[in-house]
């Protein structure tokens, strides 16, 4: 996996070909690290990913929750014909994420403010 810096305070994290029980932790550790470094927009690039199992989906949901709690954005670059896009559609999880056809499209999209919860 490689990280590719792009403008506008975002970073692209390339996901591996296959994400399953054995590889999910390593893949998503890079996403967490980017958010922990203060990057406000992290793009998970699934362009070359041809397989992901339920472990990968659970980790992705966890990263999404963590990003939202940190007032950051997780964007997914998933080509329209990708098997990953199909999995997200079948499971209904595609509605939980900001999906883009490429990392370039994800990077060019305007930042969507994450609502901050009021403090008591």
Regions found by a protein language model. Give the residues of each.
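Short beta-strand/loop segment at the start of cytosolic alpha/beta domains
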Residues: 1-14
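Amphipathic alpha-helical interaction surfaces in cytosolic regulatory modules
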Residues: 21-97
């Amino acid at each position: 996996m490689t990280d590719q810096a792009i403008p506008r305070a975002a970073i692209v994290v390339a996901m591996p070909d296959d994400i399953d029980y054995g590889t999910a932790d390593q893949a998503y550790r890079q996403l967490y690290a980017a958010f922990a470094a203060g990057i406000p927009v992290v793009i998970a690039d699934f362009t070359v990913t041809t397989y992901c199992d339920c472990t990968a989906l659970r980790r992705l949901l966890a990263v999404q929750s963590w990003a939202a709690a940190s007032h950051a954005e997780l964007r997914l670059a998933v080509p329209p014909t990708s098997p990953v896009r199909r999995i997200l559609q079948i499971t209904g999880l595609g509605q939980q994420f900001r999906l883009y056809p490429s990392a370039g499209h994800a990077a060019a999209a305007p930042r969507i403010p994450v609502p901050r919860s009021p403090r008591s």
